[in-house]
């Protein structure tokens, strides 16, 4: 007996040792674990379609060891998603380094990590139906790791709804009522887009909550291209007339009660079905309730009546015997075009709904084979074929608009033209007086180059491009045919067109004096009482021998007396501030070039260079200096003339109205007003918008509800002398969004360069209000134009430019009328009735004339054009000269466009 017992005992001991050792090791491992990961909350966590969900995950350290953890660095956090037996990585983070999977880009975040090493909660936004599943939170720190998992359920379903009588039968108001009638609500664009990302497809146009009409397409096909051609996505017809008829996309979410199938042996008519449910303390279910139950897992292969007279059944596990190979709520129609509900006397089962205080669990899905459709289904067809897309009016079906925007003629006056300014304010001014002793260059003196200051004139405007050919002429004499009275803008004083005889060159002319306030805006073209700019008097009279006669006379040198300052105490309109785009070193003003004498500098006989289309060069005669004058705040300069006593010693809150800028100065607070406003606090309107336009902070706005593509809308705005609205401040954003509550175009676009967004009116991009995730240009679909979504705080989204939306036009409160007409020059470009402030136009001389002086004029802030300075003189025919030899080492001189020798010998060498 003993020999048998000992081997058995030894076997038992050997079998027990590994088990005990494993238990001991496991216990030690549990005791040595540094932390544990836990996901708080009741499972499953529920989120709503298109919304956001926070999955809480916290790290609990069992035995804190700060020094050890600090040496190990930040923990590694990994979130994974498990669904259908497959695992996918969501994100991995360690410290500030985060890697996000492409499917979750811009949708997930760790809001507390790494600031908090114990809170690694995940925020998942823009929830989609396929976001339902298991989420696992895993943390690794050194050699320790721990994880936890939780189930997430995304509830909410978007579905297309239509009346049984016909396709596309709902107006916008009727669509909202229809969704409410079936226990749902009209879906939002975000919900439809989230459903699309979850795989939803429907080739039927339907209303959404923002009054747009859209439909989602996963597989593009000829009948369902919409506005996206061959790309998948949500097709969008834009905001349409509320009386137009379409289907509607509804959204169902909660099922606060129990939905069950009533299946009596003899089936039921519609009225019998209502009675059947009432006898059981329930009522016949609505379509929205059935969709919510299907979204919760209800699977019944048995068609039943619903409250709207439709017959449907929910399928979670698809089969060929139960509606084909796709899950969803199946609907029975009488006709292949998916219209016609079954006759109310037909017999089917019924879906009933019983209210409860708390949402009840959906009954477990039964085996589809146990709930076969009734024999009555033989006369009913379940349509699964592809239907033809709704044919919209021609303007809504077009290819995307691309390319540049071209100017169009003005056909309507938008209230342009300049208004008469207010009476001039009493303020000191500084006058400049120029004295010119002679206008004839000294031919006998040594040549001195005049100082030329070059400045780029950057200007905007719709000007025609014209290629100009510069002709180098060889003249036998200097041409002094200056445009008489041109500077005074007198249309009755024509310029001389006949060549000046050789015998009529002047030796000297009387002094010429001009007195203008620096920065004073020139009056409009037709005001005779306006101060005149410097004027050049008299044609030359003294005869000088021609080069053929062998000598050239040297008239007395001319002297240009410097500017003299004269202080006066008198009233008069003034403009202050440095000219825009010009440095102080030039010593000249954009608005005061008329202060310069209309003569050439001593020793400089060259014509002014004709500026090109891109830039122009301004020539300031040598020896002329114009000192920068003090800036005098006046109403005409759109600044308050009297200091406002500060209430708190600063500009908070700002006392200025109408978008004025508050400036703190030693004497108090001063308001810098926008164009069109004046007064101490910018509370006085100096200009007003045309009837039908709304004024806000120096601009006028007009909203148009007619739907157009972006390019058509921009062209319509240009017909008024305006552009699609540009937005530069949050206040302007709120004004447009709150006043014109529509899904509308704005002027922002990247039609020229992808990703480089610019305003159509050329103002810089100083403010942005993009929707999260925008701009995205989804699937390279040509989303080059920007819309403002009013129901979402006016945030912006980029969409294809051929959408048809309403739009708002914007123009400046102050504008200029047609430019001054000159007798010998005309303006480039097509004429318009109004021009925005800072618009620059260019004159060109008529054929046969040569241009001198700057040809540009600018629309100023007071609604008046700057004074034209261009001079047009007759062009002399070229005359060949016989070459002569130089003597005594005297150099050749350039006089006009020909060369001549000083004091030539009496016997010049013969020509060739």
Swiss-Prot record:
Keywords assigned: Disulfide bond, EGF-like domain, Extracellular matrix, Glycoprotein, Hyaluronic acid, Immunoglobulin domain, Lectin, Phosphoprotein, Proteoglycan, Repeat, Secreted, Signal, Sushi
Principal place of residence: secreted
Positions where Phosphoserine occurs in the chain: 418
GO terms, molecular function: carbohydrate binding; hyaluronic acid binding
Protein name: Brevican core protein
UniProt superkingdom: Eukaryota
Residues annotated as domain EGF-like: 647-683
Feature: compositional bias, Acidic residues: 464-478
Biased composition, class Pro residues, residue ranges: 520-537
Sites where a glycan is attached: 130, 337, 418
Distribution of this protein across tissues and organs: Brain; expressed in cerebellar astrocytes but not in neurons.
Domain Sushi: 814-874
Signal peptide location: 1-22
Gene for this chain: BCAN
Sequence ranges assigned to domain Link in this UniProt record: 157-252, 257-354
Quaternary structure and partners: Interacts with TNR.
């Amino acid at each position: 007996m003993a020999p048998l017992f000992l081997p058995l005992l030894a076997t038992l001991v050997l079998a027990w040792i590994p088990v005990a050792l494993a238990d001991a090791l496991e216990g030690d491992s549990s005791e040595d674990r540094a932390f544990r990961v836990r996901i708080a909350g009741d499972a499953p966590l529920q989120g709503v379609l298109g919304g956001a969900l926070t999955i809480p995950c916290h790290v609990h350290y069992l035995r804190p060891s700060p020094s050890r953890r600090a040496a190990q660095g930040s923990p590694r956090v990994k979130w994974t998603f498990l669904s259908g037996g497959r695992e996918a990585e969501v994100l991995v983070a360690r410290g500030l380094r985060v890697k996000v999977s492409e499917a979750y880009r811009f949708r997930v975040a760790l809001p507390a990590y790494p600031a908090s090493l114990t809170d690694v909660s995940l925020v998942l936004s823009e929830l989609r139906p396929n976001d339902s599943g298991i989420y696992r939170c895993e943390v690794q720190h050194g050699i320790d790791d721990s994880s936890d998992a939780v189930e997430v359920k995304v509830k909410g379903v978007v579905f297309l709804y239509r009346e049984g009588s016909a396709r596309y039968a709902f107006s916008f108001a009727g669509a909202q009522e229809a969704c409410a009638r079936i226990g749902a609500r009209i879906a939002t664009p975000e919900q439809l887009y989230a459903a699309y990302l979850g795989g939803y497809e429907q080739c039927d146009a339907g209303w959404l909550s923002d009054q747009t009409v859209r439909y989602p397409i996963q597989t593009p096909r000829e009948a369902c291209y919409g506005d996206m051609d061959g790309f998948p996505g949500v097709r969008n017809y834009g905001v349409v007339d509320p009386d137009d008829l379409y289907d509607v996309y509804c959204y169902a979410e909660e099922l606060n009660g129990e939905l069950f199938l009533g299946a009596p042996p003899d089936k039921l008519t519609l009225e019998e079905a209502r009675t059947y449910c009432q006898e059981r303390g329930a009522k016949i279910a609505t379509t929205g309730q059935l969709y919510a139950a299907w979204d919760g897992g209800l699977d019944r292969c048995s068609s039943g009546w619903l409250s709207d007279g439709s017959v449907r059944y929910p399928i979670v596990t698809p089969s060929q015997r139960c509606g084909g190979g796709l899950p969803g709520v199946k609907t029975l129609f009488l006709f292949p075009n998916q219209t016609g509900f079954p006759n109310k006397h037909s017999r089917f089962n019924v879906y009933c709904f019983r209210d409860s205080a708390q949402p009840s669990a959906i009954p477990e899905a039964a085996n589809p084979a146990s709930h076969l459709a009734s024999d009555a289904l033989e006369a009913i067809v379940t349509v699964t074929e592809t239907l033809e897309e709704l044919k919209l009016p021609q303007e809504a079906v077009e290819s995307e608009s691309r390319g540049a925007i071209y100017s169009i003629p003005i056909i309507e006056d938008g209230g342009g033209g300049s208004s008469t300014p207010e009476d001039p304010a009493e303020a000191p001014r500084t006058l400049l007086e120029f004295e010119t002793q002679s206008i004839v260059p000294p031919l006998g003196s040594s040549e001195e180059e005049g100082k030329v200051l070059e400045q780029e004139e950057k200007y905007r405007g719709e000007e025609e491009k014209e290629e100009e050919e510069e002709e180098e002429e060889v003249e036998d004499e200097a041409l002094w045919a200056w445009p008489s009275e041109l500077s005074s803008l007198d249309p009755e004083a024509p310029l001389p067109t006949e060549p000046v005889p050789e015998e009529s060159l002047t030796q000297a002319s009387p002094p010429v004096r001009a007195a203008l306030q620096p920065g004073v805006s020139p009056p409009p073209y037709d005001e005779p009482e306006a101060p005149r700019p410097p004027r050049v008097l008299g044609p030359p009279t003294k005869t000088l021998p021609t080069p053929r006669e062998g000598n050239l006379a040297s008239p007395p040198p001319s002297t240009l007396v410097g500017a003299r300052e004269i202080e006066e105490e008198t009233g008069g309109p003034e403009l202050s501030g440095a000219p825009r785009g010009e440095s102080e070193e030039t010593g000249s003003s954009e608005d005061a070039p008329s202060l310069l004498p209309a003569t050439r500098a001593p020793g400089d006989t060259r014509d002014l260079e004709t500026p090109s289309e891109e830039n122009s060069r301004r020539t300031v005669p040598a020896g002329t200096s114009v000192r920068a004058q003090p800036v005098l705040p006046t109403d005409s300069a759109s600044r308050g003339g009297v200091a406002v006593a500060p209430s708190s010693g600063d500009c908070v809150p700002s006392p200025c109205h109408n978008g004025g800028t508050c400036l703190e100065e030693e004497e108090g607070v001063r308001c810098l007003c926008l164009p069109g406003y004046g007064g101490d606090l910018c509370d006085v309107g100096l200009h007003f918008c045309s009837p039908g336009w709304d004024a806000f902070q120096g601009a006028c706005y007009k909203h148009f509800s007619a739907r157009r593509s972006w390019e058509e809308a921009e062209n319509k705005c240009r017909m008024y002398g305006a552009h699609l609205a540009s937005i530069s401040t949050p206040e302007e954003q709120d004004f447009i969004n709150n006043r014109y509550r529509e899904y509308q175009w704005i002027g922002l676009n990247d039609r020229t360069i992808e990703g480089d967004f610019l305003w159509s009116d050329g103002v810089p991009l100083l403010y942005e209000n993009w929707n999260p995730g925008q701009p995205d240009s989804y699937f390279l679909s040509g989303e080059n134009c920007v819309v403002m979504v009013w129901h979402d705080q006016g945030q912006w989204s980029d969409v294809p430019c051929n959408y048809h939306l309403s739009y708002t036009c914007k123009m400046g409160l102050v504008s200029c009328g047609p430019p001054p007409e000159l007798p010998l020059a005309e303006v480039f470009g097509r004429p318009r009735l109004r021009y925005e402030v800072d618009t620059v136009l260019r004159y060109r001389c008529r054929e046969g004339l040569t241009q001198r002086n700057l040809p540009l004029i600018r629309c100023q802030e007071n609604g008046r054009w700057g004074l034209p300075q261009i001079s047009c003189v007759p062009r002399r025919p070229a005359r060949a000269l016989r070459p002569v030899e130089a003597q005594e080492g005297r150099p050749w001189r350039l006089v006009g466009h020909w060369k001549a020798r000083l004091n030539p010998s009496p016997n010049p060498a013969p020509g060739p």
